[in-house]
Amino acid sequence: MNHYQIWHAIDLFAHDHGMSCSGLAKRSGLDPTTFNKSKRASVFGQPRWPSTETISKILDATHASPQDFFKYIKDNENLK
């Protein structure tokens, strides 16, 4: 699993649940800008990864299981 795959999984997960990334963040109790592409790397270009707490909030808000979410990573494992 790489940085791109996990963020792409969040993008797809939001879309498949009928939301934008901003909508998913809000529904999860997060700042609406949490999943903005501009926040996926630091100002120095270092990748920022979503925390396990963030993933947990996504799952709770959508009533999804970890397997439901990680399927999106499995489905895009050839992406780099």
Q: What spans do the regions from the language model cover?
A:
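DNA major-groove recognition helix of helix-turn-helix
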Residues: A14, K39, I73
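Alpha-helical residues within the helix-turn-helix
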Residues: H15, K26, D60
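Recognition helix of helix-turn-helix/homeodomain-like DNA-binding domains
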Residues: G29-R48
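Residues within the helices of the helix-turn-helix
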Residues: D11, S22, K26, S56, ...
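Short, charged recognition helix plus adjacent turn
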Residues: D60, Q67-K80
